């Protein structure tokens, strides 16, 4: 078995500096692969998250909001595929580079991840008819 970890969510301006330490701890625990996902704020989560920030991190609220807007084109979230999980632009590139460097230093993602359906067993259950 090849353990992996997914650092999720990366909250820009709040938890992004923790990436190298998290990857080191994951590597020390045996992780061989890692990934990350930026904070996603679809639908009503924006207001909930902003209220949480105001209550628990009022001094960093504006920094987080500015970083989110830099990732998602002046919005707090963009649901576009490939953009929603990483963002785009210089700050997204900076986080991606920090992640790659931390992976290289810890030996994570050193080998390619090979996925296989070799051990999948089809349950051979026939789809039930909705209108029976």
Q: Residues of each region from the PLM?
A:
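Radical SAM/AdoMet-radical enzyme domain recognition
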Residues: 1-6
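Auxiliary Fe-S-binding modules of radical SAM enzymes
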Residues: 17-132
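Active-site beta-loop-alpha junctions enriched in small/polar residues
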Residues: 8-12, 39-41
């Amino acid at each position: 078995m090849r353990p992996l970890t997914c650092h999720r969510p990366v909250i820009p301006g709040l938890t992004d500096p923790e990436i190298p330490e998290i990857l080191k701890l994951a590597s020390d625990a045996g992780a061989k692969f890692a990934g990350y996902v930026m904070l996603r704020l679809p639908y009503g989560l924006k207001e909930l998250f902003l209220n949480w920030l105001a209550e628990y991190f009022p001094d960093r609220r504006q920094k987080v909001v500015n970083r989110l807007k830099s990732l998602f084109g002046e919005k707090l979230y963009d649901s576009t595929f490939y953009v929603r999980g990483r963002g785009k632009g210089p700050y997204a590139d900076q986080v991606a580079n920090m992640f790659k460097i931390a992976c290289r230093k810890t030996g994570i993602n050193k080998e390619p991840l090979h996925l296989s359906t070799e051990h999948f067993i089809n349950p051979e259950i026939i789809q039930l008819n909705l209108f029976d």
